[in-house]
Amino acid sequence: MRVADFSFELPEALIAHYPQPQRSGCRLLSLDGPTGTLTHGIFTDLLDKLAPGDLLVFNNTRVIPARLFGRKASGGKLEVLVERVLDDHRVLAHVKASKAPKPGAELLLGDDESIRATMLARHDTLFELRFDDERDVFTILNAVGHMPLPPYIDRPDEDADRELYQTVYSQRPGAVAAPTAGLHFDEPMLAALQEKGIEMAFVTLHVGAGTFQPVRVDTIEDHIMHSEYAEVPQEVVDAVLACKARGKRVVAVGTTSVRSLESAAKAAENGLIAPFFGDTRIFIYPGYHYQVVDALVTNFHLPESTLIMLVSAFAGYKNTMNAYQQAVAEQYRFFSYGDAMFISRNPRAPQEKVSP
């Protein structure tokens, strides 16, 4: 399967650089997986598309201000993007510099260069850094870090992004990118869903910077997926099994919830799904048989990305690419701060041939 099969033309003007003034004020493109039928609407229409007893599964990760600017003590400027917090004082990070720091190098971080850190070791593309500070990593990042806006949002981060690039239900700090489908849910919307009898459960997947990495191979099967930490606790497993038992739908909010649930399904030795705590490299592309997820709320994704491949595996390749063409024609807003889709699973998708 070729990566180029997942390409589409996207005018620059359709990339959203700011969210809508109201979280739930975005547009919603609904795709019926079995038929391919498209319906245009607004995000609050989701209330009418869900039935009492359906289960919404959210990702409650919280984005950390993971980007730091500074310099090496020896002089050269650098930019640090924390990928993973290892403990109170150590992190794994991407480092952008004209010359990569060597083990033992001292770094001066923060806009005022008040934070001292030491480069301990290099692990492939990541650098292990230790903050030489009494405060823990999260406190330091909250004090001097910048919100890690995606590379396609071509502007500096602003104070408002600390709230806007964060779901209202986020609880577990550790992500360097927001689970963006969740950005559309505000408190009134969550209250309305509860009032209708929609069940809710929360997984955690700390989204890494790898989510924005382009696929650098020509053939999909050759791609090595980045690793992210996920947790699917027993209460989520129980909620999923209860939902299936009552004949209702498991609706994943975002591709990170999909990857968490399907990782937990793969880990189950007996039964449909089991608790999961660990790193996942699950790579979902056409041909994949979904085990748990029946419907999906998601944003519009980058051409040739692993996420449009995941959606194609869910809705069917032709349905997905047609929906994206329609979204461009109708001028939907794309990517993290853009509009949303609601998709029901196409049971025939795993057998469909991918051909443009």
Swiss-Prot record:
Known catalysed reaction(s)? 7-aminomethyl-7-carbaguanosine(34) in tRNA + S-adenosyl-L-methionine = epoxyqueuosine(34) in tRNA + adenine + L-methionine + 2 H(+)
Localization, per the record, is: Cytoplasm
Q: What is its main location?
A: cytoplasm
Pfam families reported for this sequence: Queuosine_synth (PF02547)
A GO MF label: S-adenosylmethionine:tRNA ribosyltransferase-isomerase activity
Under SUPFAM superfamilies, the record lists: QueA-like (SSF111337)
* UniProt keyword terms in alphabetical order: Cytoplasm, Queuosine biosynthesis, S-adenosyl-L-methionine, Transferase
Q: Name one GO cellular component term.
A: cytoplasm
Similarity comment text for this entry:
Belongs to the QueA family.
Subunit and partners: Monomer.
For this protein, the record's PANTHER family field holds: S-ADENOSYLMETHIONINE:TRNA RIBOSYLTRANSFERASE-ISOMERASE
Mind telling me what this protein is named?
Answer: S-adenosylmethionine:tRNA ribosyltransferase-isomerase
Specify the species: Yersinia pestis
